[in-house]
Amino acid sequence: MKSKTLMSGLVLALLAASLLAAPQKPSFSGKWKYDKDRSFSNPAGLEQTMTVTHEGDQVKMEAHVKTARGEQDVNETYTLDGKEAAFKPANPPNATGKRKASWLPNGRGILIQDETSVDGKSVSQVARKWTLSADGKTLTVDYFIDDTRMSYESKRVFSKVE
């Protein structure tokens, strides 16, 4: 009887320890500023700031982007459930979009996959992988873009300002 109680206690202790050791998913919340010196393959003159609000499996991103072609505000919300959802792409005007967002394995970051179509034909696919540095002060967004003209990769690194 004592050995069963001891064994049960040991199993519970091991279970509790494994739960405490499980990796925590990062929070991307904060204000972020683009760091051009640590980024590559982005539009000339790119400047970007972002405010991210991350609660559970929902990420809301509000960005202000400046390039040589002008300025724009981008507001997007991602639900990290791995389910496909419709969204309205900025360009071309008659485009439709499908988006899927999910956690990376072990909660190391998030993956956002967009497909843009015109008249039912896919014209671009973009995958974005968001990861945080161990100290939570650097956000890296790796872009993988395939469109009708070319395929390329870019990286945007952001420093936390708040």
Please name every model-derived segment.
Residues 1-10:
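Bacterial N-terminal signal peptides that target proteins for export
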Residues 9-18:
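Bacterial N-terminal signal peptides
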